[in-house]
C-alpha cells in the first residue's frame, strides 16, 4: 500500500469466493473480481459493490465485506512470513536462534530471486523434509559419494537442534574443483557476510529449508496437497547489485549444480517417490527407521527431533499415529 506496509489476504472474493488475483505479482491499485465486479483496495477494503443499493438495500455495507487478512511479518532476512493461524505467537519466538547461523549472510546485503521452479512430487511432504534433514543419504548422490564424503571436515560436522523442531548443520567447504565439468577450478566468489565456497544448512519445521552453497543460495518451501502429493518450490537467490560477472557465476552454479539442472534434486525426488510407492502398498514397509546415533554428521537426530515436534502438534506419537499398539494390547 501507500504506507509501504505489506499485508496478506486470502485470495478470494467476499461475495462468491471467486479467485481474485490470477498472477503471482503486479502493481494494481485495486483488485476487481471478474465475476460480479466487486473491487478491493490494497488494504483489503471493499470499495465497490455493483448495484449495491438496488440489490441489497441497506442490508450489507462495504465496510463489512473486506478481504480476510492473515498475520504477516517482514524480517529475519527480509522475507515475508505469513501464518494463517490467528492465534499464533510472535515469529521471533517460533524461530528463536535458528537463523542466527545465517544472520550475516541474510542481512549484509539485499537479496533478490534469480531462479524459481517447482515440482509436484507424488510423495509425502515429510519424506522430502527427511532428505534435507539427514546426511546419511549422501550415499544416494553421485557427486556426494565421490566428493563430499572424502573431504576434510565432512565427518566432524554436527547437527544442532533448536526449539520447535528446527535444526542447523555445521558448515563445510564445497569442493567445486572436484566436480565434473568445472576444469578443476575452485570458486573464489563467496557470499557477503560468509565464506567462500561454504555449505550451510538450516531446516525449519515443518516445511522450509535454507541452503547456502556459496556462491549460490536456495530456499525450499513445501505445500502438501495430500498424504501422497506435495508441491516443492525452489527459489534461488543472488545479491542485489551484483556485477554481471558475479551474477552469471551465481546463476550458473545454482542452476547447473544445486538447482533444476543439477543431479541432487532429481536424485532426492526419485528416492522419495520410491518410498511412497512402497508405503502405499499397505504392507510392512509403511514405516521409517531413524535410529542412527553416532558422533558424526550422519547421526539421524534431525528427523527424530522433527517427529518429536510433529507428535506435539498432532497430539499423537509419530511412532504409532493410529494407536495400533493400544488396540493390539487391548486384544
Predicted regions and their residues:
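Rieske [2Fe-2S] iron-sulfur-binding domain
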Residues: 1-86, 92-96
